[in-house]
Swiss-Prot record:
Keyword Disulfide bond: no
Gene Ontology biological process terms, A to Z: biotin biosynthetic process
Record's subcellular location: Cytoplasm
Record family assignment: Belongs to the dethiobiotin synthetase family.
Matching PANTHER family: DETHIOBIOTIN SYNTHETASE (PTHR43210:SF5)
Protein name per the record: ATP-dependent dethiobiotin synthetase BioD
Catalysed reactions listed for this entry: (7R,8S)-7,8-diammoniononanoate + CO2 + ATP = (4R,5S)-dethiobiotin + ADP + phosphate + 3 H(+)
UniProt GO molecular function: ATP binding; dethiobiotin synthase activity; magnesium ion binding
Root EC class: ligase
Keywords associated with the record: ATP-binding, Biotin biosynthesis, Cytoplasm, Ligase, Magnesium, Metal-binding, Nucleotide-binding
Pathway, per record: Cofactor biosynthesis; biotin biosynthesis; biotin from 7,8-diaminononanoate: step 1/2
């Protein structure tokens, strides 16, 4: 069943917003959905344990019954880079450990599954490992979320180059307009469309309420081989 790894050009560029929109679009098409965000920092303490807002959003778009711990098995309180948060907590943040956790979700064989990374493609894990090593172990096709703002062309092209260089397929990208005041917005988007070696799945404007349904209205899953 189709499964994809979602990465971004940076942190705070709307990966979860776009991932939730993609999941909503798949659910609206009658597909069963599942998701994983294997590691997250900046989690809030609750009576049930640490909870991450982004992971909860993804959980809300899963049609299959998943426990929070399946979606987000490694949660850390400090809002810092995951490898630093893990080090402070005395937790071994290895690609192999994250891989085992994600495989549990993939084994559910939902019609449409997303695995969302943290930050960008080269976020550090244990030792010399990066989050990209998890993506390589999973061997999933990649969807790149481009946070459209000043500098995004360089970030997007470098990310695409790294993804392809790691031997993975870049199967789509989404333009998420995080700064609508970006100079030469249309020309920047045209350059991205020309230079990125994958189809654009949609252009999401800055929305007053970026609900999964509102975001899904701007997305197209057909380039991923999912007919709607």
């Amino acid at each position: 069943m189709p499964a994809f790894f979602v990465t971004g050009t940076d942190t705070e560029i709307g990966k979860t917003t776009i991932a939730a929109g993609l999941l909503h679009a798949a659910r609206s098409a009658g597909l069963s959905t599942a998701a994983a965000k294997p590691v997250a920092s900046g989690c809030e303490p609750t009576a049930q344990g640490l909870r991450n807002g982004d992971a909860l959003v993804l959980l809300g778009q899963c049609s299959l019954a998943l426990a929070y711990e399946q979606v987000n098995p490694l949660a850390f309180a400090p809002a810092i880079a995951p490898h630093l948060a893990a080090r402070e907590a005395g937790v071994e943040l290895s690609a192999a450990r994250l891989h085992e956790a994600v495989r549990e979700v993939l084994a559910l064989q939902a019609d449409f599954t997303l695995v969302e990374g943290a930050g960008g493609w080269r976020v550090p894990l244990l030792g010399r490992e990066n989050l990209s090593d998890l993506a390589r172990l999973l061997a999933l096709p990649v969807v790149l979320v481009v946070g459209v703002r000043l500098g995004c062309i360089n970030h997007a092209l470098l990310s695409a180059e790294a993804i392809l260089g790691d031997g993975l397929a870049l199967v789509g990208w989404v333009a998420n307009v995080v700064d609508p005041a970006t100079s030469r917005l249309e020309e920047n988007l045209a350059t991205l469309a020309e230079r990125l070696p994958a189809p654009c799945l949609g252009r999401v404007p800055r929305l007053e309420e970026a609900t999964p349904a509102a975001v899904a209205a701007h997305l197209d899953l057909r380039p991923l081989g999912i007919g709607l």
